[in-house]
């Protein structure tokens, strides 16, 4: 069982698969033969367990009657595990075979042991993992193709690798100790078309032995041909019915998948091993797929775990999806869907429909550091909370103000799109007085959303419900800020919501917001300005004044004024139009220009005084002052050297010449 346990390191399905790999090391190489090979550890194990092999006419000790193997009718295979904690794999398997407990593993999928989960103790599991690592089977299944046929672990029955081919077979997933009992109950409805016997904790082994028997009996060596063998036929072989009922956990879905995977990969194991993600994903799909067996309550979580890569350990119960592989496959598992995207990504990307994206775009499009920073900052409040309505706004209110301060809001939501200058409230405060009135009107119109889209910055996408203009100065700023969150909300609602959270931040940015509100003509240029400057704004309103060549420059104006100008020397030119549009812009972009022109506030090589060497350096570099024409430290070094050398006389000239 422990071997069956999948490696934690391997991705979801791959872990179990790995376990099976390491379990069936010898089998792994020959897809078909190894399982049957009497000498193979799996074989011995299976025999010990009482697994019936293809050579045998019937399963020696297995519960699965030959009839069950032969007939496709689902056989309620009740391999009982003596206890959730599996005895040593062989013992456990034997016990399972001897005492078929109610919980049979759901899936008989022979291919990847990865799907089979030993219900047994973690120790065996760990041991299996270690074993696998030593064998070199620890590699993620995805990396190394593993013949699904031989997937049975060393302790597992050697048999079922071959049966894996049948898509119908459900790979038995070990249920966790508690789950097994539940799993068992699944009526034959869970018949495993796969020639595998499902068992519980030990079932993994027993299951394999069963599978081996079934596969062996039906297929004889054919189990080796598992992939060649018709999947349905194979499933016949080990028509083990796992009564997994709802308990069958993702494993149940796993079975068909495993079978399918084995078929897909010439070496059943290959599929699982080679594409751990796929098999795992498929298993997930199948998990939901096997409607026949109600997923255990834990199934959903299990599936998720599987997706996460928890597949190996987490799945306590292995439910064989009675549903044929096609069906199982047809059903994409919700977990799998999640699986494709990393959770973190989905968490912040998915929820913030527009806000996060806007910020991100600002960063990407603007190409300015500030936007990136903003994204991070807003990531929590903006990105995290899906609510773009008032809720989002309040939560991000403090942070959002920062965005508002940044030009991004303004140029993100260009008023021009709607033709309402108010939309891009975020412009610099300069516009506050002139635009306050217009913003009020825009608030009514939610169309701002489209204008934001035009804006390069993603942020603007949310219409700036700068309509917030209620307050001519700060009010507008707030509105501009708020609009981003409210974009989702109706303009009015957004405007209303934005004001509360935004006010504080807006206060600092108020002028900028007002500027944004300025007039539709400005919006396009502003967009550019906003974007470039947005980062600066994000860094802080102060940054504008501080960064600017001239400290006196008003911070408010700077942010609103050409953010693009501020962003880059070239930007200022581009924003000149914007500047013209924004009354404050004309005054403010020069600061940005000043920055580019280096107004002596910065320490740069353009200024003579900055190029001068330090006084002490120039002093010793000037021959008239320093007869040695060498830095004082050189003389000191020489003196020290002479002292060390024990020279009684320190001759500067001699030392120098030397």
Swiss-Prot record:
Instruction: List the protein's name.
Output: Gametogenetin
Query: Which taxonomic lineage does the organism of this UniProt entry have?
Result: Eukaryota, Metazoa, Chordata, Craniata, Vertebrata
InterPro entries noted in UniProt = GGN
**Any GO BP:** embryo implantation
Q: Which PANTHER family match?
A: GAMETOGENETIN
GO molecular function annotation? identical protein binding; ubiquitin protein ligase binding
Show the segment(s) annotated as Interactions with ZNF403/GGNBP2 and OAZ3. Answer: 496-658
Complexes and interactors:
Interacts with FANCL, GGNBP1 and ZNF403/GGNBP2.
The annotated regions of Basic and acidic residues compositional bias extend over 14-30
């Amino acid at each position: 069982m422990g071997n069956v346990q999948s490696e934690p390191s391997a991705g979801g399905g791959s872990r179990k698969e790995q376990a099976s790999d390491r379990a069936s090391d010898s089998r792994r190489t020959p897809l078909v033969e190894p399982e049957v090979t009497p000498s193979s550890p799996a074989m011995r194990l299976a025999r010990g367990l009482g697994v019936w092999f293809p050579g045998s006419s019937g399963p020696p000790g297995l519960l699965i009657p030959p009839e069950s193997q032969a007939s496709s009718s689902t056989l309620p295979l009740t391999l009982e595990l003596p206890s959730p904690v599996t005895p040593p794999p062989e013992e456990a398997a034997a016990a399972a075979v001897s005492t078929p407990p109610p919980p049979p593993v759901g899936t008989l999928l022979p291919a990847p042991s990865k799907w089979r989960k030993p219900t047994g103790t973690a120790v065996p599991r760990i041991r299996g993992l270690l074993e696998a690592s030593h064998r070199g089977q620890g590699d993620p299944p995805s990396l190394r193709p593993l013949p699904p046929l031989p997937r049975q672990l060393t302790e597992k029955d050697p048999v079922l690798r071959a049966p894996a081919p049948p898509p119908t077979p459900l790979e038995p997933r070990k249920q966790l100790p508690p789950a097994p009992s539940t799993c068992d109950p699944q009526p034959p409805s869970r018949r495993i078309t796969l020639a595998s016997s499902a068992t519980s904790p030990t079932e993994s082994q027993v299951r394999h032995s069963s599978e081996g028997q079934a596969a062996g009996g039906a297929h004889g060596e054919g189990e080796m041909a598992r992939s060649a063998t018709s999947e349905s036929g194979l499933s016949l072989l080990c028509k083990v019915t796992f009564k997994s009922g709802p308990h069958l956990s993702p494993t149940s879905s796993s079975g068909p998948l495993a079978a399918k995977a084995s078929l897909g990969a010439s070496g059943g194991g290959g599929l699982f091993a080679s594409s751990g993600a796929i098999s795992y994903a498929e298993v997930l799909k199948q998990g939901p797929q096997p409607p026949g067996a109600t997923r255990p309550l834990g199934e959903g979580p299990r599936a998720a775990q599987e997706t996460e890569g928890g597949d190996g350990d987490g799945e306590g119960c292995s439910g064989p999806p009675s549903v044929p592989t096609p069906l199982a496959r047809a059903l994409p598992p919700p977990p799998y869907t999640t699986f494709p995207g990393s959770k973190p990504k989905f968490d912040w990307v998915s929820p913030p429909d527009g806000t996060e994206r806007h910020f991100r775009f600002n960063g990407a499009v603007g190409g300015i550091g500030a936007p990136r920073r903003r994204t991070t900052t807003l990531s929590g409040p903006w990105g995290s909370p899906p609510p773009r309505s008032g809720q989002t706004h309040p939560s991000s209110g403090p942070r959002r103000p920062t965005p508002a301060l940044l030009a991004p809001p303004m140029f993100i939501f260009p008023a021009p799109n709607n033709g309402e200058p108010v939309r891009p409230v975020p412009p610099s405060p300069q516009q506050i007085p002139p635009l306050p009135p217009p913003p009020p009107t825009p608030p009514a119109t939610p169309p701002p959303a489209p204008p934001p889209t035009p804006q390069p910055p993603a942020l603007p996408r949310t219409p700036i419900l700068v309509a917030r203009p209620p307050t001519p100065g700060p009010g507008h700023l707030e509105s501009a800020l708020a609009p981003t969150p409210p974009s989702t909300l109706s303009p009015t609602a957004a405007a209303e919501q934005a004001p509360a959270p935004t006010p504080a931040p807006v206060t600092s940015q108020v002028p900028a917001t007002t500027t944004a509100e300025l007039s539709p003509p400005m919006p396009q240029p502003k967009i550019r300005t906003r974007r470039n400057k947005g980062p600066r704004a994000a860094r802080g309103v102060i940054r504008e004044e501080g960064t600017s060549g001239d400290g006196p420059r008003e911070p408010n104006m700077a942010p609103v004024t050409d953010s693009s100008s501020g962003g880059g020397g070239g930007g200022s030119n581009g924003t000149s139009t914007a500047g013209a549009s924004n009354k404050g812009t004309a005054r403010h972009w020069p600061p940005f220009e000043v920055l580019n022109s280096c107004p002596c506030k910065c320490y740069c090589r353009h200024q003579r005084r900055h190029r001068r060497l330090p006084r002490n350096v120039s002093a010793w570099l000037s021959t008239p002052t320093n007869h040695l024409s060498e830095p004082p430290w050189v003389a000191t070094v020489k003196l020290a050297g002479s002292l060390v050398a024990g020279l009684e006389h320190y001759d500067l000239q001699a030392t120098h010449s030397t």
